[in-house]
């Protein structure tokens, strides 16, 4: 059982290093017992200990003066000794213990409170698990929670990965419509057409798409990438969806996506 968190962590790290990379952590999280994982998750929920920061700042470059149009709520969780734990692994273990929906509620509430404290005026991406997206109890809770939110609800963009949404597009589309009724929005992150075909986007009823990083990396070195960016922007315009590019580091790639007219770019 302890191999699961170590395997998940290795996968997370390999994604950060590169597409064909592997990662071996000497001080492996596999040494953490199931009981310790459950205690860490339970502590986060019961004591409201997750820490929220805002990252992945995206700007519109439609004019000479960039305008911030989106940022992402990032969650930091720690064990009893104060050591930071990988959030992906943490959520996976919460799922193992049947606590992921409670964890989502805790984090959403913490994000909303942090936004209120900082008087945030830029839309914020809030990541959710599909377990919560599919839950009627979570939807009922979210409706009640948003009624207490002191800032405009349209600042909230609830997000899942394209991979997660692809497994149950109907459920995510239903959630998007529900969120729209509340006045908030939804965002599909790490999108690529091999995960969800472009022609299926309409049925998801989303407000934002954040492209997978690979699609905006070394764009001119792949004939398919410029074509895809043109197509996705055209489709997005027709469906009134705003497209974001994430972590565009190279100047030639930045110049290209800026020229395409994407809604927001983070660097």
Where are the regions that the model predicts?
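Flexible, glycine/charge-rich interdomain/linker segments that couple
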Residues: 13-36, 53, 121-129
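The catalytic core of metal-dependent phosphodiesterases that act on cyclic dinucleotides
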Residues: 145-220, 233-267
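Structural preference for long, well-ordered alpha-helical segments in enzyme cores
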Residues: 3-10, 93-94, 107-111, 142, ...
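Short acidic-capped amphipathic helix/loop micro-motif used as an active-site/signal-coupling element
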Residues: 79-84, 108-112, 190
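Conserved, mostly hydrophobic/aromatic
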Residues: 66, 90, 107, 126, ...
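Catalytic core of bacterial c-di-GMP phosphodiesterases, primarily the EAL and HD-GYP domains
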Residues: 1, 97-172, 247
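Active-site core of bacterial EAL-family cyclic-dinucleotide phosphodiesterase domains
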Residues: 29-93
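Catalytic-core segments of nucleotide cyclases and related cyclic-nucleotide turnover enzymes
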Residues: 1-19, 38, 88, 246-247, ...
């Amino acid at each position: 059982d302890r191999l699961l968190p170590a395997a998940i962590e290795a996968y997370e790290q390999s994604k950060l290093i590169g597409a064909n990379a592997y990662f071996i952590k000497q001080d492996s999280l596999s040494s953490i017992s199931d009981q310790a994982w459950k205690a860490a998750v339970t502590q986060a929920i019961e004591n409201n200990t997750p820490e929220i920061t805002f990252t992945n700042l995206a700007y519109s470059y439609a004019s000479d003066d960039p305008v911030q149009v989106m940022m992402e709520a990032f969650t930091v969780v720690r064990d009893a000794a104060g050591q930071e734990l990988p959030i992906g692994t943490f959520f996976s273990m919460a799922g193992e213990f049947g606590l992921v929906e409670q964890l989502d509620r805790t984090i959403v509430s913490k994000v909303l409170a942090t936004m209120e404290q900082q008087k945030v005026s830029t839309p914020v991406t809030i990541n959710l698990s599909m377990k919560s997206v599919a839950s009627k109890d979570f939807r009922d809770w979210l409706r009640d929670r948003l009624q207490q939110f002191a800032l405009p609800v349209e600042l909230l963009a609830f997000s899942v990965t394209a991979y997660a949404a692809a497994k149950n597009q109907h459920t995510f589309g239903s959630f998007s419509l529900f969120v729209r009724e509340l006045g908030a929005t939804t965002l599909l992150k790490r999108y690529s057409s091999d995960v969800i075909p472009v022609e299926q986007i309409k049925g998801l009823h989303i407000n934002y798409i954040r492209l997978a990083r690979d699609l905006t990396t070394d764009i001119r070195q792949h004939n398919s990438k410029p074509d895809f960016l043109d197509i996705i922007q055209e489709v997005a315009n027709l469906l009134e969806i705003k497209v974001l590019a994430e972590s565009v580091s190279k100047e030639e790639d930045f110049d290209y996506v800026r020229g395409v007219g994407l809604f927001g770019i983070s660097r």
